Curated annotation (Swiss-Prot):
This is Protein FAM43B. Coiled coil: none annotated. Residues 245-329 are annotated as: Disordered. Residues 264-279 have a biased composition (Acidic residues). PANTHER family: PHOSPHOTYROSINE INTERACTION DOMAIN-CONTAINING FAMILY MEMBER (PTHR11232), PROTEIN FAM43B (PTHR11232:SF34). Disulfide bonds: none annotated. It holds the Pfam family PID_2. Belongs to the FAM43 family. Residues 320-329 have a biased composition (Basic and acidic residues).
Amino acid sequence: MLPWRRNKFVLVEDEAKCKAKSLSPGLAYTSLLSSFLRSCPDLLPDWPLERLGRVFRSRRQKVELNKEDPTYTVWYLGNAVTLHAKGDGCTDDAVGKIWARCGPGGGTKMKLTLGPHGIRMQPCERSAAGGSGGRRPAHAYLLPRITYCTADGRHPRVFAWVYRHQARHKAVVLRCHAVLLARAHKARALARLLRQTALAAFSDFKRLQRQSDARHVRQQHLRAGGAAASVPRAPLRRLLNAKCAYRPPPSERSRGAPRLSSIQEEDEEEEEDDAEEQEGGVPQRERPEVLSLARELRTCSLRGAPAPPPPAQPRRWKAGPRERAGQAR
């Protein structure tokens, strides 16, 4: 990584032997002080000269910028479906299945890199199908989806982790992945480092959430109080430091595409009408009627028209009492 792209400081041990500051070629502070005190023995203090000479020593320290992500050479053994997301011993059955299927001599040689965003694995050898310059695609396991990691108890060199895969229709599948390392202490160190990275990322995520919630509450208080001034924008330094590796990935398949929201057609029509009135300069009188008609049309359905009512039958004439008496005569 280029030195001007690095931003984190990692303190390294002090230099074992620091060079003395020199005044001129062949002359140093310590030699000048020792010669001066030897010439004037009455000025000698009770402390030894070595202790007095430490005052003039340089206190420089070595600093390493942005420590590189640790990389391990592993053999990927495979994965198996599991029903347990976390807990002691939740990977024993899955690792047993993977070990019985692959064995100690199997697996694919890969480079495992543990970074702030999770685990990244890339094959070491070049793929024959991709040509001489082609490489197999790398596999990334995001930190928020890793639910558990451990060094297996029965196989100390095996490092296993449970990953939450997302299938179609938002279905979740838990799979246990296992890799084989060269030494048992490397597997334990890798598990410990991954847990520390996840804990630090989750702490940063909670801190940023608290900051955003507090800012939202202040904004709501100002709006409720009727204050004209709004909350000032966050400084640039805070915005740059607000990058968190524990941000949960979006649920969409594209991973990063913004969610689509519903379009308010009435508001857009009102805005367009306002713009036309401002451009034309003459208000339209039929605007309320047009809007009411449009609302009524939206409520109408596309079903067929209702069946017409049956035709009215002619009313039969009934004879009155006089006609009945005449008919009886």
